[in-house]
UniProtKB/Swiss-Prot annotation:
Compartments reported by the entry: Plastid, Chloroplast thylakoid membrane
Official protein name in the record: Cytochrome f
MF term (GO), any: iron ion binding
Cofactor binding mode and count: Binds 1 heme group covalently.
InterPro entries in the record: Cyt-f_TM (IPR024058), Cyt_f (IPR002325), Cyt_f_lg_dom (IPR024094), Cyt_f_lg_dom_sf (IPR036826), Rudment_hybrid_motif (IPR011054)
Length: 322
């Protein structure tokens, strides 16, 4: 009985360990495949997502240029919550090459660079209507100390091609670094995977070119997908092997003569990155009240002018009758 209990506990412990290991491997593989060239890479490699030139660093990995749009109110009052809607349009029928070489739907991601003092609205300040627009999205700060820079993604593009950010406007009365001015807002949005990793290596979502000119002497299809293309360089007699990852379509065949940098594969990329900007005014409530008072005064003056004119006309009419 003692031996049987020991065996049972040993077997259970081994099964638990095996399950944890498998789960961890699945998580790592899944995370690696979906996070390629998404905001996590920018967060890991750049202190600020916007370079001094105005270029957003996501463009370093997403080489294709695609449109993105942002809608914000023209003006907001201090300590109020407003919507910043980022639109990332694309053809929903398109499929992209995934890291495993298969075809799948496109994901989207975005980075929103707000003026200093503006930040993500706390949940208790977000209205039910705005929460419905946000859906299940989970936003995060680009850095713990950069609350004005928000990132999201990757998320399913078919559901979130429009992303609503709930933003809390600052109050100059409590934040002396903020003033009642017009401020710029910058946005970057991508759909689909990137072509370049931060270390400079290529993903399988881009074109692969020949690293040498010559004759293709052999094309080996690898067991797990992808190809090894052997190029015989006639100029020096050496052989060069180009590795093509899985999921790409070859444009060349054995015996074909090719040139240096000639495309070996078609371009699988159907996504891309775009950036845009908008302006927003942090409006002084006293200025609004003053404007309303001025407009009210103008309206009253017009009314009194009309009444006075009618009174004058009556006096003139009575004098003529007399």
């Amino acid at each position: 009985m003692q031996t049987r209990n020991t065996f049972s506990w040993t077997w259970i412990r081994e099964e638990i360990t095996r399950s944890i290991s498998v789960s961890l491997m699945i998580y790592i593989i899944t995370w690696s495949s979906i996070s390629n060239a998404y905001p996590i890479f920018a967060q890991q490699n750049y202190e600020n997502p916007r370079e001094a030139t105005g270029r957003i660093v996501c463009a370093n990995c997403h080489l294709a240029n695609k449109p993105v749009d942002i809608e914000v109110p023209q003006a907001v009052l201090p300590d109020t919550v407003f919507e910043a809607v980022v639109k990332i349009p694309y053809d929903m029928q398109l499929k992209q090459v995934l890291a495993n070489g298969k075809k799948g739907a496109l994901n989207v991601g975005a980075v929103l660079i707000l003026p200093e003092g503006f930040e993500l609205a706390p949940p208790d300040r977000i209205s039910p209507e705005m929460k419905e627009k946000i859906g299940n999205l989970s936003f995060q700060n680009y850095r713990p100390n950069k609350k004005n820079i928000l990132v999201i993604g990757p998320v399913p593009g078919q559901k979130y091609s429009e992303i609503t950010f709930p933003i809390l406007a600052p109050d100059p009365a409590t934040n002396k670094d903020v003033h009642f001015l017009k401020y710029p807002i910058y946005v970057g949005g991508n759909r689909g995977r990137g072509q370049i990793y931060p270390d400079g290596s290529k993903s399988n979502n881009t074109v692969y070119n020949a690293t040498a000119g010559g004759i293709i002497s052999k094309i080996l299809r690898k067991e797990k997908g992808g190809y090894e293309i052997t190029i015989a360089d006639a100029s020096n007699g050496r052989q060069v092997i180009d590795i093509i990852p899985r999921g790409l379509e070859l444009l060349v065949s054995e015996g074909e003569s090719i040139k240096l940098d000639q495309p070996l594969t078609s371009n699988p990329n159907v996504g891309g990155f775009g950036q845009g900007d908008a302006e927003i005014v942090l409006q002084d409530p006293l200025r609004v009240q003053g404007l309303l008072f001025f407009l009210g005064s103008v309206v009253l003056a017009q009314i009194f002018l009309v009444l006075k004119k009618k009174q004058f006309e009556k006096v003139q009419l009575s004098e003529m009758n007399f």
